[in-house]
Design a protein with these regions (language model features):
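Conserved loop-to-beta-strand segment in the C-terminal subdomain of adenylate-forming
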Residues: 261, 342-348, 435-437
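Short, solvent-exposed loop/turn segments at secondary-structure boundaries
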Residues: 57-59, 171-178, 206-213, 277-280, ...
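A structural micro-motif
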Residues: 34, 75, 98, 232-233, ...
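Conserved SAM/AdoMet-binding glycine-rich loop
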Residues: 77-78, 86-87, 189-316
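Contiguous mid-protein beta-loop-alpha structural module that forms a pocket-lining wall or clamp
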Residues: 314, 330-331
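Residue-level signal for inorganic ion chemistry
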Residues: 47, 82, 109, 197, ...
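Terminal RNA-binding accessory module
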Residues: 349-448
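Proteins enriched for Cys/Gly/acidic motifs involved in redox and nucleic-acid/cofactor modification
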Residues: 1-205, 218, 248, 263, ...
Length: 448
């Protein structure tokens, strides 16, 4: 590639961890002299960071390759991420793809751009075996967000029968506490108000690099130290496995200076029989206990739940076990995933395949339940004065923000409020599902 080509565009699919890693790749290119442009603008390089959790994510990758080619038919298209690690040769056949980088290679993107030329032939693949991906590369996102996604852990040693993530990201391994604190301090210096801790299985934090299974530190050690970082107003824990969410961590959050009362805890099924087939490491009793513990010490905490419908062997009766379990549980919202067959997973060989139409029906039922749960939770927060962090987006003259316990609110756009925390009274639930706010006396005193 000639030296005058200095623009790059990025698009991220999937989880918060991917967003953190895209930002790290973007900083590498920026430091090398590439200006960042929007993905629908003309660029010399288009980097697409892919997901492969669902079948839709695979298809979305192909759609965004077409977007890049529409923006600049001569632009170089580079594919990284989980899909790139799992199916590099398949991706290399997609029209417009020039380079495919695996889990190990994506953080050395610059070394693969020299002499890379646009071609009508299949893309070039650089992808190691996943067993070679046993090191840790720290990452965090910075950009147009008011929050940063800070990567503290990668990979997973669990063997859930539906999941390809261990095949795409390798063994569980963690950053050191020293590096995490250094990255958190860098984020604070950029006036970012909120950090979201991310990883594949962050509750497993502490395992070292290169196959060292001994926990040098625990997740509790990590959050205890992060709570001391100056300049960060909020720290939010992303998804954490219920069997790894200990009482001590819950209690620390309840008394914390910066950790907010918001937990996202994967359930996947409310049927113990299905959980066993999934090879999850808990049953519903433990899950219910974790929710009860949170509610005991933080009555107003937001509790999000991942759930999969249509897993093989999920009969109507077992699905209703899940539905009723969630309906009775004091949770806040659901992230609903419809089971899709993934190559090289145990679940694809299981009996009791649920018809696709039935999967869609169950998905709809759970989404309706999620909305009901969220609105009921929002109702309990009306009339309270809560701190709101306002985001950058200006949508039809409105701006949006979140309380510490993840209530989404809106008001008329005010550029002076962007990336600011204001104490506001929560008034009423609006037709779009957000909550209106008004200034509080506490906010008036803060400005005085």
């Amino acid at each position: 590639m000639s030296s005058f080509q200095r623009t790059a565009a990025y698009h991220t699919l999937g989880c918060k961890l991917n967003f953190a890693e895209t930002s790290t790749i973007a900083r590498q290119l920026t430091d090398a002299g590439y200006d960042k442009v929007g993905f629908d603008e003309k660029a010399n390089i288009y980097v697409i960071n892919t997901c492969s959790v669902t079948e839709n994510a695979d298809r979305e990758c192909k759609l965004h390759v077409k977007r890049a080619m529409k923006a600049n038919p001569e632009g170089l298209v580079v594919i990284v991420g989980c899909y790139a690690q799992l199916k590099p040769e398949e991706i290399s056949q997609i029209e417009g793809v020039d380079l495919v980088l695996g889990a190990k290679e994506k953080f050395n993107i610059l070394s693969y751009l020299d002499d890379l030329e646009k071609t009508e032939n299949e893309g070039i693949v650089h992808s190691c075996e996943i067993e070679e991906t046993d090191f840790f590369i720290g990452s965090y996102s910075i950009g147009d967000r008011t929050r940063a996604f800070l990567k503290v852990q990668d990979g997973c040693d669990y063997k859930c029968t539906y999941c390809t993530i261990p095949l795409a990201r390798g063994i569980s391994r963690s950053d050191t506490i020293e590096n995490v604190l250094r990255n958190a301090a860098e984020i604070a210096a950029k006036d970012i108000k909120e950090i979201v801790l991310t990883g594949v299985n962050i509750g497993d934090y502490g395992k070292g690099e290169f196959g060292n299974k001994r926990h040098e530190h625990t997740f509790l050690d990590l959050i205890s130290e992060l709570d001391k970082v100056e300049g960060i107003e909020r720290i939010r824990i992303s998804s954490i496995e219920p069997n790894l969410l200990k009482d001590e961590s819950i209690e620390l959050v309840s008394k914390s200076r910066s950790f907010v009362p918001h937990f996202h805890i994967p359930l996947q099924s409310g049927s113990d029989d299905v959980l066993k087939k999934m090879k999850r490491r808990y049953l519903t009793k433990l899950y219910s206990d974790r929710v009860s513990k949170i509610r005991e010490v933080m009555p107003d905490a937001a509790i999000g739940v991942d759930v999969i419908d249509g897993f093989p062997g999920e009969t109507e009766e077992k699905f209703m076990e899940t539905y009723n379990f969630l309906n009775e549980l004091p949770i806040t919202y659901l992230h609903v995933f419809t089971y899709s067959e993934r190559e090289n997973t145990e679940a694809t060989a299981m009996d009791g395949v649920v018809p696709v139409a039935e999967r869609k029906k169950r998905n709809k039922m759970l989404r309706i339940l999620s909305e009901k749960k969220k609105m009921a939770f929002y109702q309990t927060q009306l009339g309270k004065t809560l701190p709101v962090l306002w985001e950058h987006e200006n949508k039809d003259g409105k701006m949006f923000g979140f309380t510490e316990n993840y209530v989404r609110v809106q008001k008329d756009f005010d550029p002076a409020s962007v990336n600011q925390i204001e104490f506001l009274n929560l008034e009423k639930i609006l037709s779009d599902g957000t909550v209106s706010v008004q200034s509080s006396y506490q906010n008036f005193l803060a400005k005085a």
